[in-house]
A protein has these predicted regions:
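Extracellular glycan-interacting surfaces
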Residues: 1-304
């Protein structure tokens, strides 16, 4: 009798395991940010051959890049390793130098540190590794999309709101543009609309949660090609930039606008082959309608 009871219990246990396995495998998956505990801090000592050198910094926060990525929050006195492979930071359609991170592909502050990277060899995905506690823990966020990025940029307007812009699928002089927004410090990202425009992207930014810009044209443009949104990326329209006749074919590439006092300022440079005054000046334009139209103000030094 005992053998019968034991056999019956074993049979029921086996059925329970099988049912549980089936329910687990068929349940919908939920993508949650993963956390990685921070490794022990490594002190950088003067005179040590392995002393890390800051490549770029924002106040006391900076990074160093060797065969690993390190971060400091106290001007280089202490360093901690960022848990990411170097190759992921440069993956995609990038052929530049790898002795420093791709420009604009990271964000450094004492409250939030973030690095864009690419996951996967074939089906590449753009992701964000970020920390909200000065590197004690690191979170992974899936930005979205399945394309190998060329241009890539991450920025945060404040502790909650940020954006990612990247491009990919380049064919000759055209490519796709993707724009994503976060409102929870980088944990989740939502794709917003982008202009129905496929020229190569020069740069893009948001100056607040609603107002953003995308500047197109990198291959010998004849005039600036700037798009603006005033509703957080739900719609985009071409900005009107009034180029004086004497600067036609000279000021050709719009940079990203910025706030100066009560005005929006736009600098328009001469592109990669400009030679007006040695290519050392830009045009400064002012907008009074939040970026819809721009009026020429004056020439400024190219390094402004």
């Amino acid at each position: 009798m005992k053998k019968i009871i034991i056999g019956g219990c074993a049979c029921l246990a086996g059925i329970g395991i099988a049912v549980g396995t089936y329910l687990y495998e068929t349940a919908p998956s939920t993508h949650l940010p993963s956390k990685t505990e921070k490794p022990q801090q490594q002190e950088s000592l003067p005179g040590n051959g392995d002393t890390l050198q800051t490549v770029e910094s924002n106040g006391p926060v900076g990074y160093a890049l060797t065969d690993e990525l390190h971060i400091t929050y106290d001007e280089g006195r202490h360093w901690s390793r960022v848990p990411i492979g170097i190759e992921a930071l440069f993956a995609g359609e990038y052929n530049g130098q790898e002795n420093e991170l791709i420009e604009q592909s990271f964000f450094l502050s004492e409250d939030l540190t973030a690095f864009l990277y690419v996951e996967g060899a074939d089906d590449q995905r753009v992701k964000l590794l970020y920390s909200l506690d000065q590197g004690h823990t690191w979170n992974d966020a899936d930005i979205g999309g399945m394309i190998a990025p060329r241009f890539r940029k991450v920025d945060f307007l404040n502790e909650d709101h940020g954006y990612v812009v990247y491009t990919g699928e380049r064919t000759m002089s055209s490519e796709a543009t993707k724009v994503y927004m976060t409102h929870d410090s980088g944990e989740t990202w939502t794709e917003v609309y982008h202009p129905d425009h496929y020229r190569l992207l020069y740069d893009g930014n948001f100056i607040d949660e609603k107002t953003g810009f995308l500047s197109y044209g990198t291959l010998n443009p004849e005039e600036p090609d700037l798009y603006v949104t005033q509703d957080g990326g739900q719609s985009w329209v071409p900005a009107r930039i009034e180029i004086p006749d004497e600067y036609h074919l000279i000021f050709t590439t719009a940079e990203t606008p910025y706030v100066e006092g009560n005005d929006l300022v736009l600098l328009v440079n001469q592109g990669s082959s400009g030679d007006y005054k040695g290519g050392k000046v830009k045009g400064k334009f002012i907008s009074k309608d939040n970026g819809l139209s721009w009026s020429f103000q004056k020439e400024v030094d190219a390094d402004e």
